[in-house]
């Protein structure tokens, strides 16, 4: 045994076990997130539950069986429920949807309350923009005030839903495209007039020009408004008649319906296609109320854009600081204290950086920029409010110590003989640094970037103070000059997870979306890291011969 310990094999087994446990834990997280998030995309069967009669009236309920729990007689007594017998009972959590009718999206039932379970093939599921999912039977459709006559009503419903969604997308393109440009031009004219008033340069000629431009813009805006009104007439025309489990018919405007399907009539291939359509719809769709509607594209876009901007800022600053500390700064007590401070900054809680970013970047720098360059827009702030730029700078400051430490470690691993050889061949110190040392240290810089991206992408607390919001009317990037709007607020996957889990009006219904959002955040971080690792590997192979 002593010989076995002295051989070092126990430590090999210990390290191998640690790596295996880490990989298994990571795999378990991925499986958990993917499995729980699958409920949001995969069509679940809808049950028709016949309930015990109440005062001689037969009752029924329609919905998805969301969860089951077996309760012992002791648990029933603790819940103030009288056990029907000495046996355990099953409690079902039923997703009933139609929150505007029931007042809630879920209902809890015991097995004693249910007489029969049925799964009719003609149960229709409507995914709506408001008040949750709707379940029922398709009783008919109204075109305006008149009943719609069709030989195949379910196919007509699918066609009309797709048609209305196309009209909604066209209307949204008008509002967020041409109308947004015109509104921006109106704002430019207003600010120009206000600035001329402040500088006393508003003469009759300038006033006439501004008025003529406003008249032309108003003419174009009115024309777009007429197009939008015509689209809204077509969008609001149709209504779906949905009959619930008890026979009552409810009217649902077709514009509120995003998708419609019959889950109990689907075979495996139909369910796979539905899963793909749901995933595409969730990842590619954008609307101003994307958070509540389950559209993740704005949050994905905001997360990636913020991380890219953060990387653009933090890499030059971190590399320059590391080069100075290692190549130029003298080895004295001051530089030792600076290195200690840099290392300790990595352990500062992220919310502290958020408070600093709010006070320094937003209020001080942003407020100063508004007074110097955007005084005509005051008191409405331009950069003196949380936004994408300040969030990126705050996270760049948060991850700066990581990049400095990783780059300095890479510089320290480069042999001094390489530097001496370059100097002996006649190169200056700056040329040696630029053409020899820095290329060999690029893999270490990429390591710092990987660590910075991994930390920044998952941060939420500081972003809540410096720019992230629940939903955005427009993205930070559009086709309006200057195309990248750094002053705008943005959405982030980390904040969306928090908002869906704790601030959603229907937490239980949003739970699968929380898991799938978390899975997307993990995949984005892994994807960005893999890209950086690939670049690091290529550069390491390129400069491997220099280190020999």
Predicted features along the sequence, with ranges:
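Alpha-helical membrane-interface segments at transmembrane helix boundaries
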Residues: 288, 293-305, 309, 335-346, ...
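Membrane-embedded alpha-helices of multi-pass transport/permease systems
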Residues: 316-321, 352-355, 390, 397-418, ...
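Membrane-topology segments of multi-pass transport proteins
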Residues: 1-16, 20-28, 35-291, 547-548
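Transmembrane-helix boundary motif in ABC transporter permease subunits
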Residues: 310-342, 355, 363, 532-541
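Interhelical loop and adjacent transmembrane-helix boundary motif
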Residues: 467-519
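Transmembrane alpha-helices
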Residues: 404-408, 414-415, 429-467
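Membrane-interfacial helix termini and adjacent extracytoplasmic/periplasmic loops
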Residues: 275-294, 353-396, 467-469, 477-483
């Amino acid at each position: 045994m002593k010989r076995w310990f002295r051989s070092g094999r126990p430590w090999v087994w210990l390290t191998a076990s640690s790596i295996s446990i880490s990989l298994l834990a990571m795999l378990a997280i991925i499986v958990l997130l993917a499995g729980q998030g699958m409920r949001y995309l995969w069509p679940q069967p809808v049950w028709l539950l016949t309930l015990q009669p109440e005062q001689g009236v037969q009752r029924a309920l329609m919905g998805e069986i969301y969860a089951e729990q077996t309760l012992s007689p002791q648990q029933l007594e603790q819940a103030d429920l009288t056990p029907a017998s000495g046996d355990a009972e099953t409690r079902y959590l039923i997703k009933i949807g139609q929150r505007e009718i029931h007042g809630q999206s879920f209902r809890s039932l015991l097995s004693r309350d249910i007489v029969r379970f049925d799964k009719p093939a003609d149960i229709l599921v409507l995914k709506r923009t408001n008040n949750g999912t709707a379940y029922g039977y398709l009783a008919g459709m109204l075109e305006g005030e008149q009943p719609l006559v069709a030989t195949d009503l379910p196919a007509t419903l699918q066609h009309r839903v797709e048609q209305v969604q196309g009209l909604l997308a066209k209307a949204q393109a008008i509002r967020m495209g041409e109308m947004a440009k015109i509104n921006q031009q109106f704002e430019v004219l207003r600010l120009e007039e206000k600035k001329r008033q402040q500088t006393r340069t508003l003469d009759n000629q300038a006033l006439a020009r501004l008025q003529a431009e406003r008249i032309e813009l108003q003419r174009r805006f009115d024309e777009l408004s007429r197009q939008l009104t015509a689209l809204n007439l077509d969008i609001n025309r149709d209504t779906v008649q949905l009959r619930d489990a008890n026979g009552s018919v409810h009217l649902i405007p077709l514009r509120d319906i995003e998708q419609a399907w019959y889950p109990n009539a689907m075979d495996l291939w139909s369910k796979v296609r539905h899963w793909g359509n749901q995933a595409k719809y969730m990842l590619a769709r954008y609307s101003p109320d994307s958070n509540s509607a389950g559209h993740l594209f704005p949050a994905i876009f905001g997360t990636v854009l913020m991380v890219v901007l953060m990387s653009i800022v933090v890499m030059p600053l971190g590399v320059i600081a590391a080069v100075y500390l290692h190549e130029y700064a003298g080895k004295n007590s001051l530089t030792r204290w600076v290195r200690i401070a840099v290392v300790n900054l990595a352990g500062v809680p992220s919310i502290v950086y958020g408070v600093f970013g709010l006070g320094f970047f937003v209020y001080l720098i942003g407020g100063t920029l508004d007074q110097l360059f955007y005084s005509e827009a005051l008191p409405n702030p331009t950069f003196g409010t949380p936004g994408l730029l300040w969030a990126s700078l705050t996270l760049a400051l948060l991850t700066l110590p990581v990049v400095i430490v990783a780059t300095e470690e890479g510089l320290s691993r480069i042999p001094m003989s390489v530097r001496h050889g370059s100097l002996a061949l006649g190169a200056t110190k700056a040329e040696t640094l630029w053409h020899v040392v820095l290329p060999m240290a690029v893999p270490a810089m990429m390591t710092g970037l990987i660590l910075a991206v991994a930390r920044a992408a998952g941060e939420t607390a500081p972003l809540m103070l410096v720019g992230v919001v629940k939903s955005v009317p427009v993205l930070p990037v559009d086709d309006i000059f200057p195309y990248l709007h750094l002053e705008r607020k943005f959405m982030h996957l980390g904040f969306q997870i928090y908002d869906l889990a704790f601030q959603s009006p229907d937490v239980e219904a949003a739970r699968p979306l929380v898991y799938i959002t978390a899975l997307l955040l993990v995949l984005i971080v892994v994807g960005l890291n893999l890209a950086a690792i690939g670049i690091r590997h290529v550069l390491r192979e390129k400069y491997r011969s220099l280190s020999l």
